[in-house]
Swiss-Prot record:
Residues 1-30 are annotated as: Disordered. It comes from Xenopus tropicalis. It is a peripheral membrane protein. Keywords: Golgi apparatus, Lipid-binding, Membrane. The keyword Membrane applies. It is found in: Golgi apparatus, Golgi stack membrane; Golgi apparatus, trans-Golgi network membrane. Residues 10-30 have a biased composition (Basic and acidic residues). It comes from the Eukaryota. This is Golgi phosphoprotein 3-like. The keyword Membrane applies. It holds the Pfam family GPP34. A 1,2-diacyl-sn-glycero-3-phospho-(1D-myo-inositol 4-phosphate) binds at W62, R71, R152, R155. One of its GO terms (molecular function) is phosphatidylinositol-4-phosphate binding.
Amino acid sequence: MTTLTRRGRRADVGQENRVDSEDYIKDKDEEESADSKDIRLTLMEEVLLLGLKDKEGYTSFWNDCISSGLRGGILIELFLRNRVVLEPSTLRKKRLTDRKVLLKSDTPTGDVLLDETLKHMKATEPAETVQSWIELLTGETWNPFKLQYQLRNVRERIAKNLVEKGILTTEKQNFLLFDMTTHPVSNTTEKQRLVKKLQESLLEKWVNDPHRMDRRTLALLVLAHSSDVLENAFSSLSDEKYDMAMTRSKELLDLDPDTEGNKPNTCEMIWAVLSAFNKS
């Protein structure tokens, strides 16, 4: 599990799964960007973009968190698009990590990774928890019969989506013994917009209440932290603003997910994913 660090590190479903629950949160502005001129990115694309080295076009070789972070992004994205919900809270299942992910709709989203995950969920009986799905989609399971749920070549597939959207380009680089496909950032404006959004959410537009934050921004903060790429968004800040952003993000991410996830009109999947990563 990743931990927030100080300035010193800156350098470097079956039928039973289908539900018609009233407990899902209606998607207000998640489907449409608040600024229509911005390129529409999924949470997974935003996380990968934050993690990519601009010129080199690849993520840090030392980052072993981003794979599971991207899978968490898939679950939140499906929730925000009203494709899945968490089963209702009961006396026996009050904790977010105990509640199963239920399929609400298997209508295709148009995103290959999301739709592939929907097919897995539709074919899975009994339903699985958020933590189980992150492990299954990452391939971290000892059960050979469940290896079929692993999503393969996720980073490369997300990168290709970003290439198609004109944000990345594709190059071949030689690393002594092998050649590697890399994806340098070609549209720096889009990445700067993404970084600015995260910075402003913790500085100029700080609301000191996660339930008043834009849901996609809150989700990105959680996923970027879990993927160990959040600090990348703060590297351009002055020392004072950097410390303030890190302090506020730590306060936010240290909140109890079960408490926050059970508050009215909350996006419980975001807190469920955070809780799953806190346990891992």
